[in-house]
A protein has these predicted regions:
Chain B
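Polyanion-binding surfaces on beta-sheet-dominated domains and ring/shell assemblies
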Residues: 1-267
Length: 309, 267
């Protein structure tokens, strides 16, 4: 008689057997990486169910920020910002131009963000992608709304000559939340900017800058705008400062820009902020915007202390 | 505050006269024109149609929004607004009902945009026209209707709905809010969900209370827009016959939503 109980057959050797030269830890890491690639949503859900994010942060945790100013000597002002792995470098270049006829005393502030193919495989080389254009426009709106640099302070001679500031930012490593990082880089670069003393000479109809007189810093308003962004995943989880892995999975993004003493400069929300929370076995809905603003206020104070003092 | 009189005699919580017409652009699946007073936008919607291979999505329809200004070519500001429109309309559409296709929305502004950026009331008109065009096409099932209004804050803190160009020059803060209205969902009757907020200060900052106050005023304003939209659909489409379907599809949200959840779990 044949044996009744057959021993449990071992699992067929998985293709991972080719990976035998790797240690057990390395094999596990590889499996996790493959799972993350193939099922990004399920991967994120598994982490969030354990109250943690894939990079080990809590839901309302921001990544570390560091700012380095004045590293580009050829620019009139510059800054390099790291926010986790997201790295943005920003340079300010000043030129002289004629003002517009209806705004004789106002200069120009031209912010631009470039997302080159170098910074992430997500982006293609060639003309600026839609994402870069959208971010540039939002940065422009943020700088205008905060009134960081009153445009009248850029006037050299009314109706004849004004400064144009090209605030060019380039992302050199993209790991999500480029908006916050770039706004920080632009503000830091403008704080670092100095302009030569320029005088308009009506006799030759030209503006002259002197190398001998010391350069003057910009007359910025003391209220520096700082942006804090959040994302909502699956109408349940509010994730602060999303990474490039989390970003495409989010239903909603919120950016809150705060000035000094927690004055709100701008709030933009794309998608619904209603959260579905289970309480006593019942689904209730509540708005996440107010709590985001609270978290943003705490974070603003932290960043401002660390970087702008 | 309530006694504040506006230049054109409106109350602070009143929009300019709303006009809606369905233009029947011959080559689009659906089209509509929406105006707040003089601020007008024309939207056309086609879909589901064939999608370019590069932008095909295996689990849902690709939703494209193209926005054209009255003059010139669309620049970064139009791109930025069209991405905002896409994100505010997307929650209202069941794009997963037509995977591997394209849903294309093209909007033509019929009013000049002020200066460098699109005015908030024009943005609101653009969103409302888009919602109407999608309803008019009746080819993609919807969860609700997205309605938007512009709002401004005067220097004394008074909030005014749908500010005109003359008022915009004097504003301290300005913004646009879009809400999604869905009838017959849950026990509460109409469910209202804010899907787009864009609120900026012009001079100085503002606090949280002002934001919430603005949102409430906007919610009331959006409700008037919603009633106008509902009335126009009942008047202009329900008579035509094919529109029975539109209404059914809007009403069927309960069922579709549950099936949507199922699909989410499978994915």
């Amino acid at each position: 008689m044949a044996t009744v109980t057959t021993p449990i057959t071992p699992l067929p050797p998985a293709p991972t057997s080719k990976l035998n030269h790797l240690s057990q830890d390395e094999q596990d890491a590889l499996k996790a990486a493959v799972f993350q690639r193939l099922h990004p949503r399920a991967y994120l859900e598994k982490f969030l169910a354990e109250d943690v994010r894939p990079d080990g942060r809590s839901f309302d945790g921001f990544r570390d920020v560091s700012v380095n100013v004045g590293s580009i000597s050829t620019a009139d002002g510059s800054a390099l910002v790291r926010m986790g792995n997201t790295t943005v470098v920003c340079g300010v270049k000043a030129e002289i131009a004629e003002p517009e006829l209806d705004k004789e005393e106002e200069g120009f502030l031209v912010p631009n963000l470039d997302l080159p193919a170098m910074c992430s495989p997500k982006f293609k080389s060639g003309p600026p992608s839609e994402e870069a254009q959208v971010l540039s426009d939002r940065l422009n709106q943020a700088l205008l709304a905060s009134n960081l640099l009153p445009l009248k302070t850029l006037c050299i001679e009314k109706g004849k000559a004004v400064w144009v500031l090209y605030v060019d930012a380039t992302c050199i490593n993209y790991d999500g939340n480029a908006f916050d990082a770039t706004l920080l880089a632009m503000v830091a670069a403008l704080r670092n900017t100095t302009l030569p003393k320029a005088t308009y000479n009506p006799e030759i109809d030209q503006t002259l800058c002197s190398r001998k007189t010391p350069r003057v810093p910009l007359k910025l308003s003391p209220s520096l705008p700082i942006s804090m962004s959040f994302g909502i995943f699956d109408s349940k989880f509010v994730l602060a400062d999303p990474t490039s892995f989390e970003e495409p999975l989010l239903d909603t993004t919120i950016s809150i820009i705060l000035g000094d003493s927690n004055q709100i400069v701008s709030v933009s929300q794309f998608g619904s902020t209603m959260l579905t929370v289970e309480e006593d076995g019942q689904d209730t809905r509540r708005d996440a915007l107010a709590e985001c603003i609270e978290v943003a206020k705490a974070r603003r104070a932290e960043v401002a202390n660390e970087i702008f003092t | 505050m309530a006694s504040h009189v506006r230049l054109d005699g409106r109350k602070t919580t009143e929009t300019r006269p709303i006009a809606i017409s369905f233009d029947k652009l011959a080559r689009a699946d659906g089209s509509a024109r929406f105006s707040f007073g003089e601020t007008t936008a024309l939207a056309s919607f086609s879909g589901p149609i064939e999608v370019r291979l590069a932008s095909e999505l295996p689990s849902k329809a690709t939703f494209e929004v193209h926005l054209r200004p009255l003059s010139g070519v669309s620049a970064a500001d139009a791109k930025s607004l069209s991405s905002a429109i896409r994100s505010s309309l997307e929650p209202s559409l069941f794009l997963n009902k037509a995977p591997r296709t394209l849903a294309q929305l093209v909007i033509q502004s019929l009013s000049p945009s002020r200066g460098a950026s699109w005015g908030d009331s024009l943005s609101a008109a653009v969103i409302n026209a888009s919602s109407l065009a999608i309803v008019n096409a009746a080819s993609i099932p919807m969860r609700g209707i997205v309605c938007a209004v512009a709002i401004g804050s005067l220097s004394d803190g008074t909030l005014v709905l749908d500010p005109t160009d003359a008022e915009t020059a004097k504003l301290r803060g300005t913004g646009c809010f879009a809400f999604m209205f869905a009838d017959d969902i849950g026990e509460a009757g109409t469910e209202i969900d804010c899907v787009w907020t864009s609120w900026r200060s012009i001079v100085g900052g503002y606090d949280e209370k002002e934001l919430l106050r603005a949102k409430e005023v906007a919610r009331v304003g959006a409700r008037t827009v919603y009633s106008a939209i509902k009335k126009s659909i009942q008047g202009a489409i329900l008579g035509v016959g094919t529109a029975e379907q539109t209404r059914d599809e809007i009403m069927k949200t309960d069922e579709s939503e549950s099936s949507d959840d199922d699909e989410k779990m499978i994915i």
